[in-house]
């Protein structure tokens, strides 16, 4: 049962997240050979000021 976590900035609509979750689910089913109802997608929305790359703010 894949649990897929997506970290992103806040601001996407519920419709955008739903469409993205469906696309992720479709890929997981095709690639991982799992059932649709076994795929869980979790969105974690963190403000941009919490994101760093190589120790530097994005």
Language model features with spans:
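A domain-level signal for the structural core that forms small-molecule/cofactor-binding pockets
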Residues: 2-58
């Amino acid at each position: 049962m894949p649990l897929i976590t997506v970290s992103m900035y806040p601001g996407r609509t519920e419709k955008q997240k739903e469409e993205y979750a469906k696309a992720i689910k479709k890929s997981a089913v095709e690639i991982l050979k799992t059932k649709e109802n076994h795929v869980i997608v979790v969105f974690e929305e963190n403000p941009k000021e919490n994101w760093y790359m190589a120790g530097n703010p994005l």
